[in-house]
């Protein structure tokens, strides 16, 4: 490798004389315990940090100069979100709007965490009816907001969302693209995601399937042992009289205390 060539995780970019948008590889393989999902989705890694498989997007605005005047904004999309946007172009949507916001990190002394906003739209015409040469508008805004924990939904639905009206923008940048430019960005990124999955998922899937098969085999053996003759039962001295109903000294209170069975789920922090 030539000494003047610097490795990069950049997948694709579009650059004009004033702005730039680029997509970056931030993909991570799922742990063996969750091999079938392929992509990491917030599980804890070996350093006890949470890892998610993402595609990074950066928009730079150097219309006012480079250096300190260069505005750089960032946002992360899930791989399937990139493919979702690609499908919108392939289907041929003439008008389209989609947005997403994220909040993460430890709150500061004032209770604010890092927050990001992403907006993408397509409109064919200006308000005066003129056809737009670059109908796609992509905007990224970075700032801070107050996070609120979501206690509803299933395990993977739980997390944080941004409190309404708490967002404080620090910087933002946008870019306008035509259909071909955006299609090229998304298509090349989608191709990278698919090839990454084929290269990285192979060993994980094999090891995960083997681990899962071993787990099922262990469970079956344990069940067979419990059902075998002579295996000690939980209540060997059980008789039907044990559960004979008798008057209770505590009126209005059941004498039968029900205890929820205790299950341990192999759910990592998300």
Enumerate the language-model features and the residues they cover:
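Glycine- and charge-rich intrinsically disordered segments
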Residues: 1-30, 200-270
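Short, low-complexity cationic-aromatic patches
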Residues: 46-51, 75-79, 129-131, 170-182
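A cross-kingdom feature marking solvent-exposed beta-strand/loop segments within repeated
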Residues: 59-78, 156-174
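Compact, glycine/acidic-enriched structural inserts
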Residues: 68-94
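Short, solvent-exposed interaction modules
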Residues: 107-169
């Amino acid at each position: 490798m030539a000494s003047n060539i610097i490795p990069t995780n950049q997948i694709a970019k579009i650059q004009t004389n004033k702005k730039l948008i680029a997509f970056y590889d931030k993909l991570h393989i799922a742990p063996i315990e969750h091999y079938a999902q392929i992509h990491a989705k917030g599980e804890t890694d070996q350093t006890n940090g949470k890892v998610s498989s993402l595609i990074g997007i950066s928009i730079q605005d150097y219309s006012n100069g480079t250096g300190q005047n260069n505005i750089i904004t960032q946002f992360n999309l899930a791989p399937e979100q990139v493919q979702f946007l690609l499908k919108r172009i392939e289907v041929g949507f003439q008008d389209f709007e989609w947005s997403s916001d994220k909040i993460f990190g430890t709150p500061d002394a004032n209770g604010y965490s890092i927050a990001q906003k992403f907006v993408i739209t397509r409109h064919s015409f200006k308000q005066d009816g003129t056809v737009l040469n670059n109908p796609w508008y992509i905007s990224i805004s970075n700032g801070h907001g107050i996070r609120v924990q979501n206690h509803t939904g299933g395990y993977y639905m739980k997390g944080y969302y941004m409190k309404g009206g708490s967002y404080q923008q620090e910087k933002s940048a946008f870019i306008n693209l035509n259909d071909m430019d955006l299609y090229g960005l998304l298509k090349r990124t989608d191709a990278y995601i698919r090839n990454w999955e084929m290269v990285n998922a192979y060993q994980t899937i094999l090891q995960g399937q083997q681990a899962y098969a071993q787990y099922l085999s262990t469970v079956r053996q344990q069940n067979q042992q419990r059902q075998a003759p002579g295996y000690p039962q939980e209540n060997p001295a059980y008789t039907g009289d044990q559960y004979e109903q008798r008057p209770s000294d505590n009126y209005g209170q059941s004498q039968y205390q029900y205890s929820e069975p205790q299950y341990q789920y192999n759910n990592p922090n998300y």
